[in-house]
Swiss-Prot record:
UniProt pathway: Cofactor biosynthesis; coenzyme A biosynthesis; CoA from (R)-pantothenate: step 1/5
Main location: cytoplasm
UniProt cross-references to NCBIfam families, sorted A to Z: baf (TIGR00671), PRK13318.1-3 (NF009845)
Reported function: Catalyzes the phosphorylation of pantothenate (Pan), the first step in CoA biosynthesis.
Binding site for substrate: G109, A110, D111, R112, T186
Coiled-coil region list: none
EC number(s) per entry: 2.7.1.33
Cofactor comment: A monovalent cation. Ammonium or potassium.
Gene: coaX
Known partners and oligomeric status: Homodimer.
One Pfam family of this chain: Pan_kinase
Protein name: Type III pantothenate kinase
Organism from which the protein derives: Mycobacterium marinum (strain ATCC BAA-535 / M)
Length: 272
């Protein structure tokens, strides 16, 4: 059983995966709030409480964090509470197997890397990956499995909350699909702007990528896959997205874990 920890700015996903390679599957998943000042002990109490008896069945652990301080605590937690369980955390120096063809590879978030890795492994062709989180990341991986870069926009909830915080006449609303793109009250108007507006934003970015990037035209075979906790809200309004995989990041973490563990055992040549 593999423990996978995906720490983002707002929420943390904890998952358990059974099997390996093409037979791997996510058997449990939990979403908890990310606390930037959480300690290793607090993390251990929370995760041990979630996974229960499966704690004794762990054969490996892996994780990433877009919050550097939390990644440090995850490392301490694994070393102190599961010292016999091998672990691989996504950080500089870790083999991912995906070349980063960007100006500064160290700036690329670990979440973006593992998402593209998982998409390429799943579809075996060029892909555009849309991750709906605190930010919306639209990332591009070539037919050769190279990370080409992408675009980052504010997330749906973040933008909606910011609009409410900066205007006395607006308030925080529940993100839900309104009856129409033409809202009849303030809540519906904000929902329409969030749902239909961001669907248009993503469709526009995907269309621009397919126009501007060689090998991604309408005539090319390209997978467009979405992931992230707000993706289901927008999927019915998206025209460009063909696939949805809620476990894409967890599988990307698994792939990096497997690659590094096998490399350590000498069964793989070091990845680029």
């Amino acid at each position: 059983m593999l423990l996978a920890i995906d720490v983002r700015n707002t929420h943390t996903v904890v998952g358990l995966l059974s099997g390996a390679k093409q037979h791997a599957k996510v058997v449990q998943q939990w979403r908890i709030r990310t606390e930037s000042e959480v300690t290793a002990d607090e993390l251990a109490l929370t995760i041990d409480g979630l996974i229960g008896e499966d704690s004794e069945r762990l054969t490996g652990a892996t994780g990433l964090s877009t919050v550097p301080s939390v990644l440090h605590e995850v490392r301490i937690m694994l070393e102190q509470y599961w010292p016999s369980v091998p672990h691989v955390l996504i950080e500089p120096g870790v083999r991912t197997g995906i070349p980063l063809l960007v100006d500064n590879p160290k700036e690329v978030g670990a979440d973006r890397i593992v998402n593209c890795l998982a998409a390429y492994q799943q579809f075996a062709k060029a892909a555009i990956v849309v991750d709906f989180g605190s930010s919306i990341c639209v990332d591009v991986v070539s037919a050769k499995g190279e990370f080409l870069g992408g675009a980052i926009a504010p997330g749906v909830q973040v933008s909606s909350d910011a609009a409410a915080a900066r205007s006395a006449a607006l308030r925080r609303v529940e993100l839900a699909r309104p009856r129409s793109v033409v809202g009849k009250n303030t809540v519906e108007c904000m929902q329409a702007g969030a749902v239909f507006g961001f669907a248009g934003l993503v469709d526009g970015l995907v269309a621009r990528i397919r126009e501007d990037v060689k090998g991604f035209s309408a005539d090319d075979d390209v997978a467009v896959v979405a992931t992230g906790h707000t993706a289901p809200l927008l999927l019915p309004e998206l025209h460009s997205v063909e696939h949805f995989d809620e476990h894409l990041t967890l599988h990307g973490l698994r792939l990096v874990f497997e690659r590094n563990r096998e490399a350590q055992r000498g069964r793989l040549k070091p990845a680029r």
